[in-house]
Amino acid sequence: MINFFGGKAPTAAQPASSTSTAVNGARFASVSTSSSASASAAGQPPLKKTKIAPSPVTVVTTVKKKVAPPTSVEPRDPIAALSGYNSKNALPEEKRRRIIEERLAAQRQKSIESSLEAQLRAPTKSLSKSQSASSTSRRSAASFSKPKTKKPRKKVVDSDSDHDEFGDYGKSSRKPSTAPSTPRASKRTSVDPHPTSDSYQKVGRDGVQPNYTVPRDIRASTSPTNTTAIPIDTQSRPSKPISSADIVTANIKNYGPYFNGLGDAPRAVLEYPGTDASEEFLLLVPKDADEYDPLMELLATVRAIVTHYLTPEQRKAFGSLDSLEVSNNAGMILPSATHGASASTSAVCNMVAALTDSNGINGARAKSADLLDGQGSKAERRNHLVGAGTYKDTGSMTPEPHANGISQTAPVSPTSQTSGISASAGGSSVAKTVLVNNALLRLDSPAPTELSVASDHSSTPAASCGTDPDSILRSFTKARNRRDGPLFMRTLARFNSALAALRDTGALAANIADLGSCTGVPEGIWRLIQDQVYARVVGPRVEELGRYQAFSDNVYGELLPRFMSEIAQLTLLGPEKVFVDLGSGVGNLLIQTSLQTGAEAYGCEMMRIPASLASQQVVEAQLRWAAWGLRGGSAIEAWQGDFGDHGGVRDVLKRADVVLVNNYAFLPKTNENLSLLFLDLPDGAKVVSLKPFVPPDFRLTQRTLSSPLAILRVTERLYTSGCVSWADGGGKYYIQEVDRSLVREFLQNAGAATRAKRGKVSEGDDTVAASDLMVGQDVRRKRWKAALQDDDEDDDEF
């Protein structure tokens, strides 16, 4: 720049460093501008505008320096690293190494002992630590490709710590076991904390077989069975079972007629396989399905006799079993008996009047019509029905009453009745005469109407000649379906005649003997007999069984026949065995067990009404067994009282083989008192209950050694539907077997452990004495030091 005053313009100062910024240039420009302004203000001529140099460019240079690696440090001695000391140590090198090696050896020995102990506690562990360590390198490569499957941990049940002085017998008597773990991805389910062990097993339904029978001699004996179950209401033992007609008569208002042509209260007699055994039935049907159905029972009895008491050759004379239909007939009362209230009332009055005339009210058997009617009354009734000269040449004889007092209301074979009829008589007169003869044998029923005579005449052509073309079983079904009363009575007479012929010749007795030696009493027989006994004794008083105190030991519930049959099969009940039911109720299981297996049966019930019914059922069952030609066990008794105080229960438990306790609703105190009775049971006896007496976590130790539960070995089982009366579904029940070997083994091993401990003490007497001396010296030394400290403290205080 040129200066007009002859001087040079001041040169711009060079930047001090290459990193100067444009801000400095701007600062210089402002300075020069201010100086020129000041010069113009001083009167000097204006200067030319100077050119500003461009701002310098900033250049950033990055320099990379190579850092030298750190100096390598020599690795430390592994033994020195383990010991924590530096190489420079006060101890000599050899001694220091020896100490470290001994420490490592002790650690290895300790790890080996711990692994062995873990293997003994968990024997299912497959891999040891050494094997798992050697295979870790091989699994590490595969771990990147697929995820590891985590094994469930096994829970080991340890023993009690306060009984180590008895060796292994301070532990539980049951083997330790593991509980299954729940998968992490699944929902949490209930885990059984008490799995199967030697003393507690869960077998479910294994070994259960249907239709348990015991081959034995089942023929009825002439000597009465030993029993003390005498009915409370009567002092003398009845000689005959309660008939079906007696049960219906006592509740006649709930029944109505079923057959046409038989009147309001028709009676029929059914022959049984036993000697001179028969039963009287009223051929009526109930209005309600819950009531007793006499017609269905009669047909069921016929079917059972033909099925089980006859050989295939003998069965041909009765017909095919498929042709006999047995079903409930409740509510199927004749329409004529239900037209209006007046008709129903008159029908009931007629039935009551007929039953009163036959002396059938209140359980008394109807007398024979021949005993009620004289010759004059019979002649008058005959003349009223068919005229004076129609019957005098027939030659028909009215059958004599049975020696047992039961009226023979069912006619004998129609062929014998019509053998003396004149050949000149027409078909209508013959049919009418047959019907009149039937009516004469049923004098408690009204005379048949003309409609019934016509229906009887037009039923089949063979009926006019006194024979039926169908078999006996088929005729029963046809008469029931058609409501044909006369046909039903003729068919029943044919059945009685054929069965009596087999009974009189001894064929039925031989069949019963063969049946007993092959299979014993079939299920179809003992079930039917038990239903008959229950319907006659318990059925009329079933409402009284509901009178009990709720939430007490007297809550009533029954075990059904299917359940008892399963228990008998699993416990191998049979002859020469003793069965005891504690809380026997009405005695159903006593009756079933005695007849099905032939075992002695004893029961005890606290409540008065069920105990009374049980006594009556036992008597009725024995009478019915004789009617069927059968016999039960050698003894059957039902007692009333508390089984904890009853003397008979104490005596019979000493030789019992199976004890049944329905303790489903028992209080805990009752179960505890009941378990004390099990101490009298012999080895091998089984206790069946619905609640376990031995909990699954029971442990046999010195504390529980005196418990009555220590001698029981438990098996948990499952029952299905149809086994109990209070629930439709299934449940659990328990069979506890008396096994005193558990306690004996415990005591033997505990004694061996004690003797071994005493032997160790005797061998180390010197060591023990020396150790006692050292302990004594140590104690005296501590006391001397404490005394010195006390003296020092006293001196300080002074």
UniProtKB/Swiss-Prot annotation:
**What does the UniProt entry say about where the protein is found?**
Nucleus
**InterPro entries found in the cross-reference section:** DOT1_dom, H3-K79_meTrfase, SAM-dependent_MTases_sf
| Domain of life where this protein originates | Eukaryota
Question: Per the record, where are the segments of Polar residues compositional bias?
Answer: 108-117, 175-184, 220-242, 405-414
One Pfam family, please name it: DOT1
Enzymatic class: transferase
Alphabetic keyword roster? Chromatin regulator, Methyltransferase, Nucleus, Repeat, S-adenosyl-L-methionine, Transcription, Transcription regulation, Transferase
The DOT1 domain covers: 439-751
> What is a GO molecular function of this protein?
histone H3K79 methyltransferase activity
Activity regulation (UniProt): Ubiquitination of histone H2B to form H2BK123ub1 is required for efficient DOT1 methyltransferase activity on histone H3.
Return one Gene Ontology term, BP aspect. Answer: DNA repair
Q: Where does S-adenosyl-L-methionine bind?
A: 556-559, 579-588, 605, 642-643
Biased composition of type Low complexity is found at 9-22, 29-42, 53-73, 125-146, 415-425
> Where is composition skewed (Basic and acidic residues) in this entry?
91-105, 155-168
Naming one, the record's GO cellular component terms include: chromosome, telomeric region
Q: What EC number(s) does its UniProt record assign? A: 2.1.1.360
Return the annotated region ranges for Disordered: 1-242, 372-425, 450-469
The reactions it catalyses are: L-lysyl(79)-[histone H3] + 3 S-adenosyl-L-methionine = N(6),N(6),N(6)-trimethyl-L-lysyl(79)-[histone H3] + 3 S-adenosyl-L-homocysteine + 3 H(+)
The record's misc note reads: In contrast to other lysine histone methyltransferases, it does not contain a SET domain, suggesting the existence of another mechanism for methylation of lysine residues of histones.
Role of this protein: Histone methyltransferase that specifically trimethylates histone H3 to form H3K79me3. This methylation is required for telomere silencing and for the pachytene checkpoint during the meiotic cell cycle by allowing the recruitment of RAD9 to double strand breaks. Nucleosomes are preferred as substrate compared to free histone.
Could you tell me what this protein is called?
Histone-lysine N-methyltransferase, H3 lysine-79 specific
- Tell me the classification of the organism that encodes this protein: Eukaryota, Fungi, Dikarya, Basidiomycota, Ustilaginomycotina
What is the gene name? Answer: DOT1
